[in-house]
Amino acid sequence: MSRIGKKPVQVPAGITATVDGQKVTAKGPKGELFFVANDEISLKLENNAVVVTPVNQTKDARSKWGMSRTMIEGIFKGVKDGFERKLEINGVGYRASLQGKNLQLALGFSHDVLYEPPVGITIAVPKPTEIVVSGINKQQVGQVAAEIREYRGPEPYKGKGVKYADERIVRKEGKKK
């Protein structure tokens, strides 16, 4: 069993955190986020740290304990530094560009794909083959990156498509004559 939940979450400098029952709110230089914990988890603010404890020792409560602590740590990191996910595009004629705030992708379809990012997410295109998705909500940044990758995921024979920058594609050998 993981014991990550036992460690209190320190509130970083420059962030104000408040605990109101099951809700933790964090305000920082990048914005404001909140997390509502399950009823089986109790939250307390002690010595500039959020202490997460399960209400009872049921398996269900213990399973939500570490997750709640990690979520609180994530909102603190998000309002302080933010999160970003980098994507790379491989393939002849595959490229990305920005049209205002929308992302335009040429991925070998008969039409260009236009992706409108949700509120709170910023998309940057430093090169036509690179996309950087950034924001303060870790889950939302990952979701947007996954949606962009889904338009044309990397294929195993030539590696063409959209992939995460840190992703390794297992390549397959073509058929032999």
From Swiss-Prot:
GO cellular component, one term: cytosolic large ribosomal subunit
InterPro entries hit by this protein: Ribosomal_uL6-like (IPR000702), Ribosomal_uL6-like_a/b-dom_sf (IPR036789), Ribosomal_uL6_a/b-dom (IPR020040), Ribosomal_uL6_bac-type (IPR019906), Ribosomal_uL6_CS (IPR002358)
Gene Ontology biological-process entries: cytoplasmic translation
UniProt cross-references to Pfam families, sorted A to Z: Ribosomal_L6
GO molecular function annotations of the record: rRNA binding; structural constituent of ribosome
Keyword list, A-Z: Ribonucleoprotein, Ribosomal protein, RNA-binding, rRNA-binding
SUBUNIT field: Part of the 50S ribosomal subunit.
Family: Belongs to the universal ribosomal protein uL6 family.
Functional description taken from the UniProt entry: This protein binds to the 23S rRNA, and is important in its secondary structure. It is located near the subunit interface in the base of the L7/L12 stalk, and near the tRNA binding site of the peptidyltransferase center.
Protein name (database record): Large ribosomal subunit protein uL6
Naturally occurring in which organism (per UniProt): Rhizobium leguminosarum bv. trifolii (strain WSM2304)
